[in-house]
UniProtKB/Swiss-Prot annotation:
The keyword Protein biosynthesis does not apply. Belongs to the TRAFAC class TrmE-Era-EngA-EngB-Septin-like GTPase superfamily. AIG1/Toc34/Toc159-like paraseptin GTPase family. IAN subfamily. It comes from Mus musculus. This is GTPase IMAP family member 9. Residues 42-46 are annotated as: G2. The gene is Gimap9. The keyword Nucleotide-binding applies. Residues 6-208 form the AIG1-type G domain.
Amino acid sequence: MAGQGDTEVRIILVGKTGNGKSATANTILGRRQFDSKICANAVTKTCQRAYREWKGKNLVVVDTPGLFDTKETMKTTCFEISRCVLYSCPGPHAIILVLRLDRYTEEEQKTVALIKGLFGEAALKYMIILFTHKEDLEDQSLDNFVSDAGEKLNNIISQCGKRYLAFNNKAALDEQENQVQQLIELTEKMVAQNGGSYFSDKIYKDIDSRLNHCLEELKETYAQQLTSEIERIEKEYAAKLEKGKAAQIVFAQRNHDEKLRNLKEKAEETVFMYIFQKIKEILSKLWDELW
């Protein structure tokens, strides 16, 4: 999208409910942004986005709910995937599959299959496996843990280019920051191996184009509204004393500035249903196979 520089790093967190996606997001953000609790019901019910300025980079972290919760309908799942695509536009630098060290299920395989089904095999070139509960390794190295893991888990790791790391989301702040450093370095290395650019495909390019078009239309509309409002104020005060005119113009300008601050969100709202329909078309073909 317009206005986004090379310093932005967009990260999507995916995985099974309870694997620690929100806790991992909070570690990356350096603050408690998302609720993260050990409970029977998922804390994250909808796709969420948050930002952090970190060592000259603008991190965009997208936290997602468990997409394979059996109670969810296809409509709800389409909505969440659509939000994920919208929040990570024009494309993610990293898709992080969050796993627990002590728990690997069929849902992780389905998540990878879903990503391939939606975005193609090329998306796997941007995937990283992130294990939570690093503290449970104790004296064992992560490499040894992976080498001793079962065939299914190693198959997933291989599909993701054998890119993996582990987080202890309860660690002291300095250790958490070291983990973030490790993740960003792994992401940058992966992006460099992929030609130096973030992941993009037909869906992302289409949506980014529509968002940019919508942004320009909104800017033009808001500028016209401001001009019309100032002209109205000028006419109203033409036959009156100047007192109050300046305040009216300042108010109109502030209203215009507020609209510009919310420009991105307004554009996203405008194109959301288009994204939803595109995702629904693809997901309807995968639904019976994966759910």
